[in-house]
C-alpha cells in the first residue's frame, strides 16, 4: 500500500532523511485509508442494526470497546516511526565534518565554507544567453554550492536583508533565512548529483529569480574543486 502512495509524489527523494519522511507520509496515508474504511463499515453496521433491531434493547459494549482500542492502536502505529525519525534527525545534528554558511540577499545567495579559509562566493541565476545545453531555465546558477557526498554537512542559514527561505524540495530541506538569526541544520547526502531549489519566501520583485543549485560530488572531486576555486 505504501508503494501506491509513493507513486503520487511530486518529486523523488534523494537523501536518507527525505526517503524516511517519504515513507512515513505514505505509511500515514495508508493508515488514514484504513481508518476511513473501518469507520464507513462501522457506521453502515450501526445504521443497519438500528433498523433491524429497533424493537429490541441492545447495548453496544463491544462497539464501545472497539472504538476505544482502535484509535489507541492507530496512534501507537504513528508514534513509533515518528519518534524514530526524530531520533535519527537528532543524531544528524550531533556532529558535522563541514560547515557551510548560506546568506540570502536580494536576489542572490552567498556561500562561505567556514572550515576552508578564503572559500566564499556569490551565486546568481544564469540569464538565458549564459545557459549551456541541458541546463534548466530559471534554476541554473553561475556558481553552484558544491559539497561531498556521504559527509555530514552543517548548514548555517541567515539573511543580509529581508526574510528568505533556502529550500530544496527533492531533499526535504527548507529553512528560513532571517536577518540577525543564524538557523542551523545538519544533513548527509548519499547520492551524487545536482539538486535545484528556489527561495520559498516572497522577498521582493525578483523573488522568482533566486534559484539554488547544490552539487553533491565525490570527496576527491570536492577537494579538487576547492583548490580550483581558491586559485
Curated annotation (Swiss-Prot):
Q: How does it sit in the membrane?
A: Multi-pass membrane protein
Classify the main location: mitochondrion
Family annotation (Pfam families): COX2
Q: Which residues bind Mg(2+)?
A: 201
What does the record say mutating residue 61 to L does? In strain: BW287
Mitochondrial matrix topology ranges: 52-64
All ranges on the Mitochondrial intermembrane side of the membrane:
1-30, 86-231
As for subcellular location, the record says: Mitochondrion inner membrane
The residues that the entry says bind Cu cation A1 are: 164, 199, 203, 210
Write down the chemical reaction(s) this protein catalyses. Answer: 4 Fe(II)-[cytochrome c] + O2 + 8 H(+)(in) = 4 Fe(III)-[cytochrome c] + 2 H2O + 4 H(+)(out)
Enzyme Commission (EC) number: 7.1.1.9
- Which InterPro entries is this protein grouped with? CcO_II, CcO_II-like_C, CcO_II_C, Copper_CuA, Cupredoxin, Cyt_c_oxidase_su2_TM_dom, Cyt_c_oxidase_su2_TM_sf
Name the needed cofactors. Answer: Cu cation
Which family, according to UniProt? Belongs to the cytochrome c oxidase subunit 2 family.
Role according to the record: Component of the cytochrome c oxidase, the last enzyme in the mitochondrial electron transport chain which drives oxidative phosphorylation. The respiratory chain contains 3 multisubunit complexes succinate dehydrogenase (complex II, CII), ubiquinol-cytochrome c oxidoreductase (cytochrome b-c1 complex, complex III, CIII) and cytochrome c oxidase (complex IV, CIV), that cooperate to transfer electrons derived from NADH and succinate to molecular oxygen, creating an electrochemical gradient over the inner membrane that drives transmembrane transport and the ATP synthase.
The protein in question is named Cytochrome c oxidase subunit 2
Q: Which gene encodes it?
A: cox-2
Amino acid at each position: 500500500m505504501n508503494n501506491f502512495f509513493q507513486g503520487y509524489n511530486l518529486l523523488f527523494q534523494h537523501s536518507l532523511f527525505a526517503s524516511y519522511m517519504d515513507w512515513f507520509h505514505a505509511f500515514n496515508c495508508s493508515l488514514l485509508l484504513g481508518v476511513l474504511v473501518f469507520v464507513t463499515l462501522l457506521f453502515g453496521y450501526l445504521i443497519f442494526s438500528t433498523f433491524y433491531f429497533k424493537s429490541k434493547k441492545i447495548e453496544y459494549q463491544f462497539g464501545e470497546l472497539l472504538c476505544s482500542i482502535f484509535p489507541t492502536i492507530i496512534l501507537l502505529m504513528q508514534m513509533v516511526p515518528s519518534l524514530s525519525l526524530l531520533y535519527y534527525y537528532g543524531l544528524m545534528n550531533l556532529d558535522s565534518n563541514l560547515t557551510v554558511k548560506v546568506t540570502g540577499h536580494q536576489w542572490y545567495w552567498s556561500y562561505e565554507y567556514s572550515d576552508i579559509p578564503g572559500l566564499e562566493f556569490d551565486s546568481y541565476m544564469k540569464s538565458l544567453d549564459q545557459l549551456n545545453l541541458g541546463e534548466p531555465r530559471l534554476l541554473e546558477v553561475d556558481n553552484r554550492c558544491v559539497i561531498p557526498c556521504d559527509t555530514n554537512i552543517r548548514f548555517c542559514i541567515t539573511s543580509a536583508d529581508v526574510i528568505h527561505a533556502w529550500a530544496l524540495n527533492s531533499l526535504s530541506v527548507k529553512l528560513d533565512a532571517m536577518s540577525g538569526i543564524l538557523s542551523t541544520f545538519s544533513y548527509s547526502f548519499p547520492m551524487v548529483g545536482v539538486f535545484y531549489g528556489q527561495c520559498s519566501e516572497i522577498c521582493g520583485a525578483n523573488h522568482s529569480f533566486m534559484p539554488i543549485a547544490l552539487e553533491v560530488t565525490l570527496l576527491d572531486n570536492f577537494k579538487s574543486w576547492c583548490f580550483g576555486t581558491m586559485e
